[in-house]
């Protein structure tokens, strides 16, 4: 018997589905960013104990939310989102409330962006299945602050930043276990 939920993270969650697993799709920005397939082919590579990628946030964009809302079946898929311009308002107001959403605040393959405490509170209010994806370099105080704002689910973590892209797998597991 498996306790808890098994998650399949991006980029693999975009393409692979198993029974009793939740796929995390994305990460999606509000506006479209072309080149996903080319960047996947170009940058996803096996490395010792894991994978390397430099996909960034190439995605179809969430500005046409109707395209995604049909596939956002409660309990099966979760959409990871990021506001590269730190404007979270369209996500809060346009995504149907109650759907499983992951706020990605820790991607090493793009520039920095932020989210305010007020925006976190709004996401917590409108999305009961909210989770936050963190950086492997996250400060424990930041996790405590998010928890005090109502976040109860944390995705540990995004990839380890390197000059070749983000590294996942065993090297990341060693870092994340210290945060559990």
Tell what function each PLM region has.
Residues 24-29, 34, 41, 100-106, ...:
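Non-cysteine beta-strand/loop elements that form the S-adenosyl-L-methionine
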């Amino acid at each position: 018997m498996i306790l808890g939920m098994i998650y399949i993270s991006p980029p693999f969650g975009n393409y692979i589905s198993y029974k009793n697993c939740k796929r995390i799709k994305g990460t999606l920005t509000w506006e479209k960013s072309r080149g996903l397939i080319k960047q996947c082919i170009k940058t996803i590579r096996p490395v010792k104990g894991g994978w390397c990628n430099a996909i960034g946030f190439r995605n179809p964009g969430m500005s046409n939310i109707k395209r995604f809302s049909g596939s956002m079946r409660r309990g099966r898929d979760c959409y990871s989102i990021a506001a590269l311009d730190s404007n979270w308002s369209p996500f809060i107001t346009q995504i149907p409330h109650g759907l499983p959403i992951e706020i990605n605040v820790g991607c090493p393959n793009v520039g920095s962006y932020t989210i305010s405490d007020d925006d976190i509170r709004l996401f917590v209010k409108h999305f009961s299945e909210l989770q936050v994806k963190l950086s492997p370099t996250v400060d424990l105080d930041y996790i405590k602050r998010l928890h005090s704002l109502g976040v109860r689910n944390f995705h540990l973590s995004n990839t380890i930043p390197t000059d070749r892209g983000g590294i996942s797998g065993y090297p990341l597991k060693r870092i994340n276990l210290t945060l559990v």
